[in-house]
């Protein structure tokens, strides 16, 4: 099992949660193919919406890759992103970026937030997931 961070605006993540899927890197297939069934993903939202200039900076969703299928859909006319099915977990609270910064491995991952998708250690992933699933 591997552990990943995906990056997207919160409103885009909510669309995926409602539909039971994830998209990465503006619909590219390659990052989705790096993940396998039962791998875990946490999404980081730098902004509430893609158009917004105001920072949001929180880890906002937690899930598990449901199967081995990478598939393409027409989201709207002329846009055919690739997706993966995800079993989304219920979270009790989002994890602010400032909390993630307290983890000893943070410096190794900080610069990767601009890449859209990257693998993290089980320890770092569990640190975020535990924060997100515990009562405040």
Curated annotation (Swiss-Prot):
S-S bridge residues: none
Matching InterPro entries: EVE_domain, PUA-like_sf, UPF0310
Protein name, per record: UPF0310 protein HH_1062
Similarity field: Belongs to the UPF0310 family.
Gene3D superfamilies: ph1033 like domains (3.10.590.10)
Record organism: Helicobacter hepaticus (strain ATCC 51449 / 3B1)
Superkingdom classification of source: Bacteria
């Amino acid at each position: 099992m591997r552990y990943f961070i995906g990056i997207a605006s919160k409103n885009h993540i909510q669309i995926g949660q409602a539909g039971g899927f994830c998209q990465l890197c503006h619909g590219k297939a390659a990052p989705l193919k790096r993940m396998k069934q039962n791998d875990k993903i946490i999404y980081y939202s730098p902004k509430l919406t893609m158009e917004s200039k105001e920072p949001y900076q929180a880890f906002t969703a937690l899930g598990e890759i449901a199967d081995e299928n990478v598939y393409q859909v027409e989201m709207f006319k002329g846009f055919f992103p690739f997706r993966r099915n995800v079993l989304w977990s219920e979270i009790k609270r989002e994890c602010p970026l400032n909390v993630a910064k307290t983890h000893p491995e943070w410096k190794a991952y900080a610069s990767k937030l601009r890449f859209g998708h990257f693998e993290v250690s089980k320890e770092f992933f569990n640190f975020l997931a535990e924060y997100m699933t515990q009562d405040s």
